[in-house]
């Protein structure tokens, strides 16, 4: 707040004079003179006796001096002098209070701006909740969650495919096992047939050996008979008989032997052919069954290896799925904890903002109270100035008569003073008062002095 009063007035009396220097501001009440001003001074000398005193006010190089007249009561006396002193004291306290509040407001504004520069993108008194810096983190988390969900779905699909493949291989294994059991049963049946054929072959061999022994026995008997007959024919006995022609036993025996040999050979050939045929077919069937059994055994081993591989892959996929689920749960827990911390930080910042807003509202109310006090003080200052103007006019209208009877115009200025004040208020778009200017014009002895009082109203918090 600045209050400037410029002008020049002169009060002449027998005791002394009061001087107001241009560029300062002065208030005169009786024998009290107060003059705060930038690069200006105020002095009051009454009756050759001066005394000085000062109080704190706005700016540097501002002071006041108070002088008391020893032998004259001054312009005012009694309660008016005390009232003027109280007004001066209250004005000084008001100026000090306003200065301290302006410094406190400036400090708070700097702190608020610094806090916004550190904790948010807002500037000045804008209370923006900018969470755009968290959007990228949230989008990244969403992408990771979507990727994890897709990966989990792929793993579930692969697991289902592996389970279906395992079921298919299990079904094939059961079919091959049934086929293998059937082949083994056929092989066992063929082995029984082979045993029967072996027994038949042994029986035929026994029969052949028996026939061979019988043939050998017959041959031996025939030889013995032939020897007997030859011995009998070698004697001198001549027997002449008239008989029918005898049967040739040798030819009969030879024929019988040939028939038996042919029959035995035929039986042997038939037995060998049948044995070879059955053996060949049995060997072919055995070889076929052995090849099929070998192929089935190889396929069974391959299926066992595939089953073991699939079981291992299934176990690894199950473990990987479990680890992914654990990792997903842990990641969700971590990000949930981080989001909770961020929410807590946001809540703390909102509480701080609410506290700052409350403090700002309190300062606003205090500022409004100070504005009311300022208005009251301005009214008191106007009253004070009116009193000063009235006393100056009375002092100028008082004539001084010396012993020789000359008129008082020889010692006083007879010029008439005229004051004109203009009040200018500056408002913003919301109707808040930004500045208050009071322009005063004093006319004295055809001279114009400007009195300007400017009041800057601090901007209110939004």
From Swiss-Prot:
Residues 80-115 are annotated as: Coil 1A. It comes from the Eukaryota. Residues 1-79 are annotated as: Head. Keywords: Coiled coil, Intermediate filament, Keratin. Residues 138-229 are annotated as: Coil 1B. Residues 253-391 are annotated as: Coil 2. Residues 392-459 are annotated as: Tail. Disulfide bonds: none annotated. Residues 230-252 are annotated as: Linker 12. One of its GO terms (molecular function) is structural molecule activity. Residues 80-395 form the IF rod domain. Residues 116-137 are annotated as: Linker 1. It holds the Pfam family Filament. InterPro entries: IF_rod_dom (IPR039008), Keratin_I (IPR002957). Residues 264-290, 392-413 are annotated as: Disordered. One of its GO terms (cellular component) is intermediate filament. Coiled coil: none annotated. Residues 265-279, 392-407 have a biased composition (Basic and acidic residues). Heterotetramer of two type I and two type II keratins. Belongs to the intermediate filament family. There are two types of cytoskeletal and microfibrillar keratin: I (acidic; 40-55 kDa) and II (neutral to basic; 56-70 kDa). This is Keratin, type I cytoskeletal 26. It comes from Mus musculus. The gene is Krt26.
């Amino acid at each position: 707040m600045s209050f400037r009063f410029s002008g020049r007035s002169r009060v002449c009396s027998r005791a002394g004079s009061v001087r107001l220097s241009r560029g300062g501001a002065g208030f005169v009440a009786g024998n009290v003179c107060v003059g705060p001003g930038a690069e200006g001074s105020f002095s009051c000398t009454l009756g050759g006796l001066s005394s000085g005193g000062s109080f704190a006010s706005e700016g540097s190089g501002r002071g006041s001096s108070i002088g008391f007249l020893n032998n004259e009561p001054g312009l005012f006396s009694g309660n008016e002098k005390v009232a003027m002193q109280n007004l001066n004291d209250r004005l000084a306290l008001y100026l000090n209070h306003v200065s301290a509040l302006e410094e406190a407001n400036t400090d708070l504004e700097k702190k608020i701006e610094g806090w916004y520069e550190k904790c948010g993108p807002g500037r000045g008194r804008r209370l923006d909740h900018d969470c755009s810096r968290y959007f990228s983190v949230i989008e990244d988390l969403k992408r990771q969650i979507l990727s994890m969900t897709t990966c989990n779905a792929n793993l579930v699909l692969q697991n289902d495919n592996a389970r279906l493949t395992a079921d298919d291989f299990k079904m094939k294994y059961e079919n091959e096992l049934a086929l293998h059991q059937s082949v083994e049963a056929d092989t066992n049946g063929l082995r029984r047939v082979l045993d029967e054929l072996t027994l038949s072959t042994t029986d035929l061999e026994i029969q052949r050996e028996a026939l061979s022994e019988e043939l050998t026995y017959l041959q031996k008997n025939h030889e013995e008979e032939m020897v007997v007959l030859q011995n009998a024919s070698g004697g001198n006995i001549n027997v002449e008989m008239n008989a029918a022609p005898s049967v040739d036993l040798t030819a009969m025996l030879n024929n019988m032997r040939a028939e038996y040999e042919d029959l035995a050979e035929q039986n042997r050939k038939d037995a060998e052919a049948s044995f070879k045929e059955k053996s060949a077919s049995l060997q072919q069937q055995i070889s076929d069954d052995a090849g099929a059994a070998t192929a089935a055994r190889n396929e069974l081993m391959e299926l066992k290896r595939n089953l073991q591989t699939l079981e291992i892959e299934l176990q690894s996929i199950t473990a990987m799925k479990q680890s992914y689920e654990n990792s997903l749960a842990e990641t969700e827990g971590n990000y949930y904890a981080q989001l909770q911390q961020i929410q807590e930080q946001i809540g703390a910042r909102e509480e701080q903002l609410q506290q700052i807003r409350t403090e700002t509202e309190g300062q606003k109310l205090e500022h409004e109270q100070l504005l009311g006090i300022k208005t009251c003080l301005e009214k008191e200052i106007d009253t004070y100035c009116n009193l000063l103007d009235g006393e100056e006019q009375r002092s100028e209208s008082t004539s001084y008569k010396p012993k020789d009877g000359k008129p008082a115009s020889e010692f006083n200025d007879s010029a008439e003073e005229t004051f004109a004040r203009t009040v200018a208020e500056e408002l913003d778009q919301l109707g808040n008062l930004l500045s208050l200017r009071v322009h005063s014009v004093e006319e004295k002895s055809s001279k114009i002095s400007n009195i300007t009082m400017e009041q800057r109203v601090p901007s209110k918090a939004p």
